[in-house]
Regions:
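Acidic/histidine-rich catalytic cores of soluble enzymes
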Residues: 69-70, 160-258
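A structural motif
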Residues: 67, 129-134, 228, 273-274, ...
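N-terminal pre-domain/capping segments
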Residues: 28-134, 296-326
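Alpha-helix-loop-beta-strand connector modules within alpha/beta enzyme cores
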Residues: 87-104, 155-167, 193-198, 259-264
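Glyoxalase I/VOC metalloenzyme domain signal
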Residues: 55, 64, 293, 310-360, ...
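Acidic-and-aromatic substrate-binding clefts and catalytic sites of carbohydrate-active enzymes
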Residues: 49-56, 73-84, 106-116, 144-149, ...
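Active-site acidic/histidine proton-transfer and metal-coordination neighborhood
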Residues: 11, 15-22, 30, 37-40, ...
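Hydrophobic faces of well-ordered beta-strands that scaffold small-molecule active sites
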Residues: 42-48, 70-72, 98-103, 137-139, ...
Length: 674
């Protein structure tokens, strides 16, 4: 908001009447991105400490992402090279309001002379707030050694502070820090507020401070909504460490971590609270990342969170976005490669070896359909358009993935409302325009459903190849999973992207040991197992994943896994067609037999076809890989038995070592001599 007593600033006009910098309004209301549309309902905010950049860069990113306002963290104000009144004007110029000033530390329970000094400090903060146009200050519970305990003592302090603040048009919000010296629980903070009994004193709730201490969020439901002045939200991975260090370095956006933030927010909503929702995120990666991307992720997380709350607490007063539900996904309809005419011949030859049949040709484009059972691989050799641009950037690579969903139109609408970039690609007369959004590495994710003409894709857009015949191939049935590679710092972004748009969950992250360093891996999957995507985060280019990113200039899909019903029959059929499996060392099979107590005949069979093996309490897993190709993409064939739900993570270090040997041109020779 503008400073108190000053005329309201026009969003697109600066204080001196000049047109505001275009960056302040860039993206608003454009491009089908609903996150940039201002809402008159749900009020959203983010603390300036949550993202990187100087103050102006932060405001530009926050405004562009579609927030209503900000929390000004004192450090950002102190570092700003202008007066408090200039802060107010600058925030207003970006179409934002200052919803909170924080933090005011070490206040309650102090003996004299510290108590008087604390009130003097508060008066000076009130001066700043009046100048910048902010009417709510966050007071966090005292951690000072001099602080004295006692609810009544603290309540008396807040009653006096509320009286002083009220005369200045300011409200005081009390927050219990999880590591507070005497008050570290929102229930105690509420009791202080209740006993203070002042209209200008209320409670501030922070999901991290409650959930990190395993405090039942249902205890919030008994607090009157009008006495909750502000709500801060943060998630975090479950880590056993010091609360302060955990909070200051590992918070993340709601939905990116492991805390029950939805349960917390349901309890808040049940109180009748209808004020702002704000993100207060301390995260080392975020503070070194792109302000625009982090702000966008935050807004997406708030919209997705409130949609979850609305569906489980339908009678809440707090405004919530009205968006379609998360999409139910029935698997991968097709994977499209972009390539050149020359490299297409190599790719087509390899698919033929793997048992795929050239089944169709696009009616107007240079796109060939290769099929095996429910797997469709497209090879695009167009010399213009999106696919060609992707080829020029990444080389032969996956440019498109199409997913089968329950309702394509609703999926696109939900994605749009959550800030995904929707894309419309040209279609010829009578051809289908398949709805799409931009995904990892700039690739397309398209959506196809059974309730529209999209279900007739192969009939409408493709001409069958004469004599294509049987497409059963070597027994590859469907796409088991897609492995997407990215920089490690992007993993939270794409985790939230998938889990907020599609009805999927995230599997705990695992560390994959590569001779060149660690790769972090996390699977995104739905309950049926029909959609599985593994996200692999590379921290340097010495790992196989990092090498892929470097060589392909950021392409996403590094490998595709196909499911079969009989791993040995498929492996034998592939070997007969000239397929070269990635050879594993004899040491791997010796260790495998010792680990699982496998008999020699079974081990010999595995080694013959270079098949890797894993098992857990649920079932068994078989996998083998193609050797490296010039495109940097490789293929995996898997079989899951008896409910095995993993990805053979224990085998990953040995597979990567074998691939690096192959990459360097010195592969082991499989037992078959291939």
């Amino acid at each position: 908001m503008p400073p108190r007593g000053a005329p309201r600033s026009c969003r697109n006009e600066s204080r001196d009447g000049r047109a505001a910098d275009d960056s302040r309004t860039a993206g608003k209301g454009k491009g089908g991105n609903a996150m940039t549309d201002r809402s008159d309902t749900l009020r959203t905010s983010i603390a300036t400490v949550s993202i990187a950049g100087d103050f102006r860069e932060k405001l530009a990113a926050i405004s562009r992402a579609g927030y209503t306002g900000i929390e000004i963290f004192e450090q950002d104000f102190i570092a700003f090279d202008g007066a408090p009144v200039d802060v107010g004007w600058l925030v207003a110029d970006y179409g934002l309001e200052i919803m909170l000033f924080q933090p005011f530390r070490d206040f309650e329970g102090l003996p004299e002379p510290y108590r008087s000094r604390a009130f003097d400090r508060a008066e000076r903060k009130f001066d700043l707030m009046n100048s910048m146009g902010c009417d709510l200050v966050l007071v966090c519970s005292n951690i000072a050694a001099a602080a004295l305990g006692g609810i009544d003592r603290a309540a008396d302090d807040f009653a006096e502070l509320g009286e002083r603040a009220g005369k200045r048009g300011i409200r005081v919000g009390f927050e219990a820090l999880a590591w507070g010296r005497h008050i570290n629980d929102h229930r105690d903070a509420w009791e202080v507020v209740r006993r203070a009994d002042h209209s200008h004193v209320g409670l501030i709730l922070d999901s991290f401070h409650t959930l990190s201490r395993d405090i039942d969020p249902q205890t919030i439901r008994s607090i009157p909504g009008d006495k909750i002045f502000f709500v801060q939200l943060a998630d975090a991975p479950k880590i056993d460490m010091d609360l302060f260090y955990w909070s200051r370095h590992f918070r993340n956006m709601p939905g990116e971590g492991d805390l029950p933030v939805v349960d917390f927010m349901r309890a808040v909503a049940a109180t009748g609270y209808d004020g702002p929702l704000s993100l207060e995120i301390f995260n080392d990666q975020f503070r070194a990342g792109s302000p625009v991307e982090i702000a966008r992720d935050g807004h997406r997380s708030l919209m997705g969170l409130m949609d979850d709350v609305r569906r489980s607490e339908p009678d809440i007063r707090l405004p919530a976005p009205d968006m379609p539900p998360r999409a139910q996904c029935g698997g991968v309809e097709f994977v499209e490669f972009t390539t050149s005419e020359e490299e297409a011949a190599e790719l087509a030859g390899f698919l033929s070896v793997m048992g795929f049949t050239h089944a169709g040709t696009h009616v107007s484009k240079q796109v060939a359909q290769w099929r095996q059972n429910d797997i469709n691989i497209l090879i695009n050799t167009e010399e213009s358009g999106f696919a060609h641009s992707a080829y020029q950037t990444h080389g032969t690579s996956v440019c498109d993935i199409a997913l089968r969903v329950d309702d394509a139109a609703q999926t696109i609408e939900r994605a749009r409302m959550l800030g995904a970039e929707t894309v419309t690609t040209p279609a010829g007369e009578g051809e289908l325009s398949i709805p799409a959004i931009r995904g990892v590495g700039g690739g397309m994710i398209r959506f196809i459903d059974a309730g529209s003409d999209l279900a007739r894709l192969w009939e409408i857009d493709f001409v069958p190849v004469a004599g294509a015949g049987d497409v059963s191939g070597v027994g590859l049935r469907r796409v088991d999973h897609l492995a997407q590679t990215m920089k490690y710092e992007e993993m939270l972004t794409w985790t939230l992207f998938y889990t907020s748009i599609l009805d999927t969950g995230k599997v705990p992250m695992v560390d994959v040991v590569d001779p060149g360093g660690l790769v972090r891996s996390r699977a995104i999957q739905n309950d049926s197992g029909e959609l599985r995507v593994t996200l692999n985060g590379a921290e340097n280019q010495n790992t196989l994943a990092g090498h892929f990113i470097d060589r392909t200039f950021g392409a996403a899909v590094q490998h595709i896994a196909f499911a079969c019903d009989d791993i040995f029959a498929t492996a034998e059929a592939l070997a007969a067609r000239g397929f070269e499996a990635l050879a594993m060392s004899a040491n791997y099979y010796d260790d495998l037999g010792a680990r699982f107590g496998l008999d020699e005949a079974f081990l010999s069979r595995l080694q013959t076809f270079s098949i890797l093996y894993d098992e857990d309490a649920q079932g068994r897993f078989f996998q083998f890989y193609s050797r490296r190709r010039s495109s940097e993409i490789f293929f995996e064939i898997v079989q899951r038995l008896d409910g095995y739900d993993g990805y053979g993570a224990a085998n990953a270090p040995f597979r990567i070592s074998a691939q690096k040997r192959d990459l360097n041109g010195s592969p082991f020779t499989a037992a078959t001599g291939n």
